[in-house]
């Protein structure tokens, strides 16, 4: 499941950034049942059923298990937060592809260390992957979400910009975060069973029937 042990500070050693390749479905499915590391936090976008852990270190492993804080030294208490994740063609709910469907005004919740934040989407647009100026630090009130605009290799990225809802009480934001996270978790569990486990079971049953048929010949 996509709920991690949440750290309370940055790790002393951050992995060296790796060249990131398009994700393979088998690697993502393997990672989804083998989550055994701590995360910096969790991002929840309820309108598109996205709930993913936030890791530090731009590596293939971290990107297969969730999302990555692109600039880990930028704490959302004093800086803009930038989160990047993969777009998976087979099912956008697996990782971060669902953010391309976020509409203006949509809610986004973030847990980062022990703090909770609520944001409202202000824009959702396509940029070139080289447009790093779009990710400039604008202070603590902004959140950037990034994914590829397709599941194949592409020079373009989806960039969602959201603004912090500063007037919401912390306890209300925390309660909303956990409520939406739990709802998405239940939905993802059902989706996983229907899309992956059920077809596998059908294949196994058909294989068994075929073997029995061959054995009786």
Question: What are the residue ranges of the model-derived segments?
Answer:
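Solvent-exposed, non-transmembrane regions of membrane-associated and secreted proteins
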Residues: 1-216
């Amino acid at each position: 499941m996509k709920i991690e042990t949440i750290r309370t500070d940055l790790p002393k050693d951050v992995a060296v950034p790796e060249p990131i390749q398009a994700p393979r479905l088998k690697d993502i499915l393997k990672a989804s049942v083998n989550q055994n590391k701590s995360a910096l936090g969790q991002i929840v976008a309820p309108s598109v059923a996205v709930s993913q852990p936030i890791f530090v270190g731009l590596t293939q492993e971290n990107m297969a298990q969730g999302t990555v804080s692109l600039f880990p030294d930028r704490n959302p208490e004093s800086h803009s937060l930038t989160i990047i994740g993969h777009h998976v063609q087979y099912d956008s709910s697996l990782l971060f592809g669902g953010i391309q469907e976020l509409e203006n005004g949509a809610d986004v919740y973030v847990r980062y260390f022990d703090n909770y934040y609520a944001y409202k989407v202000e824009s959702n647009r396509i940029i070139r992957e080289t447009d790093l100026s779009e990710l400039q630090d604008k202070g603590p009130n902004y959140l950037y979400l990034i994914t590829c605009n397709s599941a194949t290799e592409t020079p373009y990225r989806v960039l969602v910009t959201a603004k912090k809802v500063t007037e919401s009480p912390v306890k209300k934001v925390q309660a909303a975060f956990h409520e939406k996270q739990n709802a998405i978790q239940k939905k993802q569990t059902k989706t996983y069973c229907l899309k992956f486990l059920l077809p596998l079971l059908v294949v196994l049953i058909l294989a068994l029937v075929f073997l029995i048929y061959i054995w009786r010949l």
